[in-house]
């Protein structure tokens, strides 16, 4: 009987110890919503040392950033760090809409060691788009252009690169991951219809809702041009488990 009691006590202590360890994961915490001239040089993603939270069981550390830019505008930066529900560690990079015109990309990292969500900048995956080549090949299309944290009803009209297909005018609503924000975007785009975010409805822990006005469908190019440019539109997603990502990053140019 005594041996059974000792065995039960050991199992109980091990269970408490395991639960304590599971709850001891600490993550950096921050949320950022701003416009940057060149995020690869000016955006500091470092969290304050005292901004730390302890995760619940079943949560990992996460860091997520969404970047949206139109030609001639500043770049909208929406960034979140903290604990989030996730089963496995993973790094994901998505280019929703390629240049020329409005560009949208995101990066998210889920990791399972304390304060592992410690990226300091976005220079590894964000490079300022080179507009020198496309600016010399302008088509007949011009679009109101802006990226704003609020309304941009008086956006200036900008000429579009020849490979763009329409004027985009929409808003991106973001919630979760400490965010509750709306981005207003206008500009030339290679996307077809209301698909700046390629119909993807989440970015890391953030839920995404994209809505467009009627003006997004104005001034489409000829069907032949639309089909030709559509072939060059790309959406690519890279999702790797953490060990593979660490190997890849050590060889990053």
From Swiss-Prot:
Q: What Pfam families does the annotation carry?
A: UPAR_LY6
Q: Quote the InterPro entries the UniProt record gives.
A: Fert-Immune_med_protein (IPR051899), LY6_UPA_recep-like (IPR016054), Snake_toxin-like_sf (IPR045860)
Q: Name the SUPFAM superfamilies for this protein.
A: Snake toxin-like
Query: How does it get modified after it is made?
Result: N-glycosylated; by high mannose and/or biantennary complex and/or certain types of hybrid oligosaccharides; possesses different oligosaccharides chains according to its subcellular localization in the testis. Sheds from membrane raft by ACE and released from the cell surface of epididymal sperm while it passes through the caput epididymis leading to disappearance of TEX101 on spermatozoa; is essential to produce fertile spermatozoa.
Cellular compartment(s): Cell membrane; Membrane raft; Cytoplasmic vesicle, Secretory vesicle, Acrosome; Secreted
Q: What is this protein called?
A: Testis-expressed protein 101
Membrane topology for this entry?
Lipid-anchor; GPI-anchor
Keyword Repeat: yes or no? Answer: yes
Primary place of residence?
membrane
Please name the GO terms of the biological process aspect recorded for this protein, alphabetically.
Answer: binding of sperm to zona pellucida; fertilization; flagellated sperm motility; regulation of flagellated sperm motility
This chain is encoded by the gene named TEX101
Query: How does this chain assemble?
Result: Interacts with VAMP3. Interacts with LY6K. Interacts with DPEP3; co-localized on the cell surface of spermatocytes, spermatids, and testicular spermatozoa, co-localized only in cytoplasmic droplets of caput and corpus epididymal sperm. Interacts with ADAM5.
- Signal peptide location in the record? 1-24
Q: Decide whether keyword Amino-acid biosynthesis is in the record.
A: no
> Which keywords does this chain's UniProt record carry?
Cell membrane, Cytoplasmic vesicle, Glycoprotein, GPI-anchor, Lipoprotein, Membrane, Repeat, Secreted, Signal
Q: Which organism is it from?
A: Cricetulus griseus
Q: Which domain of life is it from?
A: Eukaryota
Which ranges are cleaved off as propeptide? 227-253
């Amino acid at each position: 009987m005594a041996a059974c009691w000792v065995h039960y006590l050991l199992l109980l202590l091990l269970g408490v110890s395991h639960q304590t360890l599971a709850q001891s994961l600490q993550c950096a915490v921050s949320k950022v919503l701003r416009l940057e001239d060149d995020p690869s040089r000016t955006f500091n993603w470092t969290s304050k040392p005292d901004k730390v939270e302890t995760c619940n069981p079943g949560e990992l550390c996460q860091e997520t950033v969404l970047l949206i830019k139109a030609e001639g505008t500043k770049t909208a930066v929406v960034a979140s760090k903290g604990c989030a529900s996730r089963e496995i560690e993973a790094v994901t990079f998505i280019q929703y809409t390629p240049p020329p015109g409005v560009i949208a990309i995101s990066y998210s990292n889920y990791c399972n060691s304390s304060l592992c969500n410690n990226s300091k900048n976005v220079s590894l995956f964000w490079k300022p788009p080179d507009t020198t080549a496309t600016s010399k090949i302008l088509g007949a299309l011009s679009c109101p252009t802006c990226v704003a944290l609020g309304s941009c009803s008086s956006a200036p009209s900008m000429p579009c690169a020849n490979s763009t297909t329409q004027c985009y005018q929409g808003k991106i609503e973001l919630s979760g991951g400490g965010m509750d924000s709306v981005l207003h975007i206008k500009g030339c785009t290679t996307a077809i219809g209301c698909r700046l975010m390629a119909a993807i409805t989440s970015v890391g822990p953030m839920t995404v809702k994209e809505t467009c006005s009627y003006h997004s469908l104005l001034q489409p190019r000829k069907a032949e041009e639309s089909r030709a440019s559509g072939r060059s539109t790309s959406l690519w997603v890279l999702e790797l488990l953490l060990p593979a990502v660490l190997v890849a990053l050590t060889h990053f140019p």
